[in-house]
Amino acid sequence: MEKNTTSSCIFCDIVQGSITSYKIGENEHAIAFLDAFPVADGHTLVIPKKHAVDFSSTDQKELQAVSLLAKQIALKLKMTLKPSGLNYVSNEGAIAGQVVFHFHLHIVPKYETGKGFGYNVNKTNKRSLEENYQLISESKN
């Protein structure tokens, strides 16, 4: 496991075991634990063990590990807590709501009570689908 690239990453501290967490799953490159500030029962975070600031900067190996572990956790949550559905959420950048700058995937169970994750759509002047398609498809990435 590569060393934390920031001096004060709480998720790196959890990976290293210097901060206690409610770990509910793990594989070679990822770990899953209950969110300390849950928005619903069973709200879980799945993170790569190797520090990466966000989704876009996370290596493929770690992304695959996070994805596979997220699926295992989702099945555990469905079997044990019986939610009506699940939200999978990752915020990238402060403006998008990212608070901890170590890539993490939220798995938020949804129950009939309506509690849990939700979002509001902001109405803006949007480019047409055709304009967005042209911009994105011409990118070399």
From Swiss-Prot:
SUPFAM superfamilies named among the record's database cross-references: HIT-like
Motif (Histidine triad motif): 102-106
Domain of life per record: Bacteria
Regions crossing the membrane: none
Limits of the HIT domain: 10-117
BP-aspect Gene Ontology terms: nucleotide metabolic process
Disulfide-linked positions: none
Gene Ontology molecular function: catalytic activity
Name of this protein: Uncharacterized HIT-like protein MG132
Source species: Mycoplasma genitalium (strain ATCC 33530 / DSM 19775 / NCTC 10195 / G37)
